[in-house]
Swiss-Prot record:
Annotated source species: Nitrosomonas europaea (strain ATCC 19718 / CIP 103999 / KCTC 2705 / NBRC 14298)
Name of the protein in its database record: Phosphoribosyl-ATP pyrophosphatase
PANTHER family reported in the protein's UniProt record: HISTIDINE BIOSYNTHESIS BIFUNCTIONAL PROTEIN (PTHR42945), HISTIDINE BIOSYNTHESIS BIFUNCTIONAL PROTEIN HISIE (PTHR42945:SF9)
A GO term, aspect molecular function: ATP binding
Annotated GO CC locations: cytoplasm
Record-annotated membrane-spanning stretches: none
Taxonomic lineage from the root: Bacteria, Pseudomonadati, Pseudomonadota, Betaproteobacteria, Nitrosomonadales
Length: 112
């Protein structure tokens, strides 16, 4: 099973939870909460991932990153963005220098 397959399956499950009962589904509860609540949860999970990295704790890095990705998928679902949209963007960037890509974003359009 590929990573993209797992992400797609998880995204479908999250999408299906949009209409689930928030009193029995954590995912439905987050999907039906305010955007700020979801964003705070992402910030919390990002901080926990950072702390696991600082501690050089491989197992915790994996665990916390999984939490972070899960909550990011919830955020993406709320904005009707699929994992495939993100994977396409990563594919588009493949082989492009990060410095070069950033410079292209800051250059004004010369045709104007």
């Amino acid at each position: 099973m590929t990573a993209s397959t797992i992400l797609q399956r998880l995204a479908r499950t999250i999408e299906a939870r949009k209409n689930a009962d928030p009193s029995i589904s954590y995912t439905a509860k987050l999907l039906n909460s305010s955007q700020d609540k979801v964003l705070k949860k992402i910030a919390e999970e990002a901080a926990e991932t950072i702390m696991a990295c600082k501690d050089n704790d491989r197992e915790q890095i994996i665990y916390e990153t999984a939490d972070l990705w899960f909550h990011c998928l919830i955020m993406l679902t709320r904005h009707d963005i699929s994992p495939e949209d993100i994977l396409r963007e990563l594919e588009r960037r493949e082989g492009i220098s990060g410095i070069e890509e950033k410079l292209s974003r800051s250059q004004p359009n010369k045709t104007e």
